[in-house]
Amino acid sequence: MVKVEYSVKKQDYKNRLQQEEEEKIVHQYLANEFYSGGTMFTVTNVDEQIKGNDCFYITDTSGYTIDEKAFVTYINIDIPTVALELSIINRGDKTQDGWFLNGNNTNNSYVFTNIVSATTLDLRSVEDIIETKTFLITKKAIYDYLASMGWNKDKLKAKCKRIWDNPNEPLERTNYDAHNKQDYLKFQRISHVDKQGHVEKSIILKLRRDKLIKHADIVL
């Protein structure tokens, strides 16, 4: 397989349904390359999927209920950060918790996948994927890491409210690394397209992958 010669950031015009198909391809790839050390069950029940449960993974020592996060809008780019969705303003102009803060989600872990090498920018099969950077981390481990920087769920929700209410609210930078020009933690406003093509606004929290991965249970 030959990696395409360039890196491109895919834009929001890419249909969300197409992204979901690519996420399924990534899941198939992970089933072969990442979950091979235990037993994995893919969740097909829609109600469970809505609760953030994409698969169950059982090893000799642990059991994980996993929400998979594959960055399919970035192919052939080694992304140095991981983004957690904190808050959403939906097309009805109503604010709701994002998947990281949503209390209705019952997953206890996340699997983050960055596709750093592929033969195409539009995945059509597992064979298109050459290499990923993937890690499994529990939700508790992320909250513990955030707590070490002074953040908990209530403070994150309060921060999101201030960001929505005030366009000038600072998007905080914690432990800025001047040498690498990266933050350990940073809030960001973004817009994305839902399945029906409507624009939704979100607040995400960006964390450095190299810092977060130190708290992971499994790394590929």
Positions of predicted regions on the chain:
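Nucleic-acid endonuclease domains
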Residues: 1-52, 60, 64, 70-220
